[in-house]
Amino acid sequence: SAELSEVNLESINSLFNDLSSKPLITDMDVNIQELNVYGYKILNANIKYVPTNKNVSIQILSNDVVGNILWDSKENLLKAGFEKLHLKKNNTLVDDESKFIFSDAPKINIKAKSLMLDEDAYGDLSLIAFKENKMWNIESFKIISPDHTINGSGLWDDEGLSPNTSINFSWDIANIEKTFDQLSYPELIKDGKASVIGMLSWPKSPFDFDKSTLKGNFSLTATDGVVLEAKPGVARLFGLLTLQNLPRRLSLDFSDIFSKGFIFDKINAGVIVNNGILKSNRFSMVGPAAEVSIKGETNIIEETQNIHVIVNPRISDSLSLLSLAGGPLAGAAAFIAQKILKDPLNKIMSDEYQIIGTWDEPEEIQTPQIERFGEMISQEILQPSSEFLNIK
């Protein structure tokens, strides 16, 4: 066995070249203090290398990585299986030192039961990729956690003047609350399910993800959850959207409804991503208490936002239910009248405002509405009433 202080795995790729001839090394047992693997590092690793029958078997054992790599020269296939693959970014490497170099790039099939990059845990990973026309074709990748699953495919140009990664993905979330906890956004949403479908691209490799250079778009659908009370940071912004200030704005007492968050039946959104800025002209959140529509943008790098919010509380339906105290006929009449009048209470009591500033200290700007109340009353109540009662 041998002891080495620092090794780039890419620098010994000659071991894998021309495996039809006798390998340069018959076997190897090396302890490496720092093993650099495409921009990430493995500390205090034991590497065992054994070529057999024109194949190469490598065993890697460390506190952070446990697995085996098999090179099938006949099929030009690199298969890797890891019980644990916990990698830490090596920020001391320059780009040229982290090139994924092979003289004849193999097809890659990687499985890892526990993937972690830096401090971010991703779960179970499977990846199939091959190189074609100087570009890596990511045939498929899947990340499975107990509460969510990501499927995708994509392309990775690692040889051009401007390296780039682009992926198409679908993200199925069985439990939003637990998934957000895993992503370090605890106590933001309770329960809930979601589906996210989109396309994203960024410079450099799939492993060198930088949200400040992220571009693309995605659609979001979420159901049956609760946006919880305001917390510091991004959750503070969500807190504003839970309508906890709505009772003050409407001078009505809804504290029993909103004190513990906003229950939503469904959230729909289409989002454009451009260099870390998320923009949406169609974000809607519907719940038993209100309908919320949002458009604007938020900067996930600077943690700021400029969004326009319209809140339509579902007051008329609630009042219809309360009117049942006067008897079933009274309740039914109130409900039908409100629907014929196109929910005038909901529209008159709607709230409109702008949220700017930072996530930690958002600033709320109320939009004046008094001047439009007269017109709204005429359009939504007087005119429909006249038509319904056949008044001329």
Model regions: which residues?
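Small-residue helix/turn framework positions
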Residues: 2-15, 25-36, 61-121, 126-356, ...
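Extracellular beta-sheet-rich ligand-binding/adhesion modules
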Residues: 36, 44-46
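Short, solvent-exposed mixed-charge patches
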Residues: 390-392
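C-terminal accessory extensions/subdomains outside the catalytic/core fold
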Residues: 360, 366, 379-380
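N-terminal beta-strand/beta-hairpin edge segment
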Residues: 45, 54-58, 141
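Aromatic-rich beta-strand edge motifs centered on tyrosine
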Residues: 49-51, 131
